[in-house]
């Protein structure tokens, strides 16, 4: 499912919610359900933000603005721009959150969201049934009024208690379900592809290879400008405003020369180091970032406190069998931008590999050692094209990644919900909550 399709799904879901009296009333009276709708609005804003480049006659965030106004009319607080800008989702997160609304509605009302009609329901079913049943009471009008009132109040209390139990069961079931996915007790994909696991390792190896090629290039280009550059090269004999900067880059006594020649590589190497470590940890089935490690630790504490879980998997297959497109995209983008575009980057002090290649090809840069120059040009070309194998491996791996097993995960969630619903509420029940916004997992 694409972001565009998820946008349509969220739009249809919110259209039902804000045009059904029962669901509108629920937003007013149930803070948990209101938070669920709040999360859907943030997702809708994010999805519309991604569509801004598409030509349309409608203003930006047209759908969000419409539903947000209805949300405020129901007595809810307005979302700030800071909250909206902070909402970020990858494809998996967005799909999970879009599907969660139907799960929440089903747990509250025991029926699918799509079964609700727009502007058709005016009363909650249990109340209307109580009022209908009260027609067959004793003939005494006074007794009948009192009896009706008592039955109605009793029915309302039972209805509120049942709804409270459902909200509690839903929250605890979702907390357990989310935590078990985070620690690896629940596998959320359709199958375990060995190809994907080894592709993670291949991506790591390709990133490390680029890292070491970058080091080799940095060493050679600095050695060239220190010992082998011809100071009479046409590049250093032009009369323009850049002349001073260009001479300083070739001047062996200038401390800025190293950073001018190496900055683009150093930035690339830092990103490659973090990215390579991330994919290596994912290959091992371990948390691959500070954020995922923090989420995993919170999930473990929650499961220990609320459900008495003492043992956790040492390997999380949800990490091993999912290729994360975010790191792939940013690695390719940063590498190409910093190292493969000569253009005007030189004006910012970057003498990257693409620029060095162009200067040699145009005879603007001359070496006192043609042999060393050939080695430098060779390593520069190798560095520029080193991103190609990484890109091919990454794209193939991502395209073959297994899809989410929604049927199985929904079945597990519903099982946990029924288990929690059957448990009585105790006075000493823990108030611990899972401090992870659902369902942003494995981003």
Swiss-Prot record:
Descriptive protein name: Uncharacterized protein MG314
Organism of provenance: Mycoplasma genitalium (strain ATCC 33530 / DSM 19775 / NCTC 10195 / G37)
């Amino acid at each position: 499912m694409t972001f565009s399709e998820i946008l349509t799904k969220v739009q249809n879901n919110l259209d039902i919610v804000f045009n059904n009296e029962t669901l509108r009333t629920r937003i007013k009276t149930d803070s948990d359900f209101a938070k669920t709708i709040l999360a859907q609005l943030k997702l809708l804003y994010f999805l519309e933000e991604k569509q801004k480049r598409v030509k349309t006659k409608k203003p930006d965030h047209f759908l969000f603005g419409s539903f947000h106004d209805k949300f405020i009319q129901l007595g809810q607080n307005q979302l700030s721009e800071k909250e909206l800008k902070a909402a970020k989702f990858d494809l998996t997160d967005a799909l999970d959150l879009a599907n969660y609304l139907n799960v929440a509605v089903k747990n509250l009302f025991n029926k699918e969201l799509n079964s609700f009609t727009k502007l058709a329901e005016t009363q909650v079913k249990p109340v209307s049934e109580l009022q209908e049943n009260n027609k067959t009471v004793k003939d005494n009008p006074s007794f009948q009024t009192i009896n009706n009132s008592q039955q109605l109040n009793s029915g309302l209390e039972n209805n509120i208690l049942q709804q409270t139990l459902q909200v509690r069961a839903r929250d605890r079931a979702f907390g357990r379900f989310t935590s078990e996915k985070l620690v690896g007790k629940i596998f959320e994909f359709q199958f375990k592809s060995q190809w994907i696991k080894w592709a993670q390792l291949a991506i790591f190896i390709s990133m490390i290879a680029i890292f070491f090629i970058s080091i080799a290039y940095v060493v050679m280009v600095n050695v060239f400008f220190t010992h082998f550059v011809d100071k009479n090269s046409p590049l250093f004999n032009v009369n323009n405003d850049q002349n001073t900067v260009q001479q300083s880059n070739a001047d062996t006594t200038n401390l800025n020369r190293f950073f001018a020649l190496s900055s683009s590589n150093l930035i690339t190497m830092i990103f490659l180091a973090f990215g390579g470590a991330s994919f290596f940890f994912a290959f091992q089935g371990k948390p691959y970032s500070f954020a995922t490690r923090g989420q995993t630790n919170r999930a473990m504490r929650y499961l220990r406190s609320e459900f008495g879980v003492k043992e956790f998997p040492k390997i999380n297959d949800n990490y091993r069998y999912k290729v994360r497109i975010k790191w792939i995209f940013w690695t390719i983008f940063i590498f190409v931008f910093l190292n493969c575009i000569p253009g005007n980057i030189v004006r910012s002090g970057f003498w990257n590999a693409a620029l060095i290649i162009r200067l040699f090809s145009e005879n603007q840069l001359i070496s006192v050692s043609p042999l060393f120059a050939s080695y430098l040009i060779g390593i520069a070309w190798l560095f520029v094209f080193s991103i190609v194998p990484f890109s091919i491996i990454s794209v193939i791996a991502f395209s073959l990644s297994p899809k989410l097993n929604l049927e199985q995960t929904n079945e597990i969630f519903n099982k946990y919900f029924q288990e929690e619903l059957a448990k009585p509420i105790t006075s000493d029940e823990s108030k611990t909550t899972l401090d992870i916004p659902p369902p942003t997992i494995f981003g």
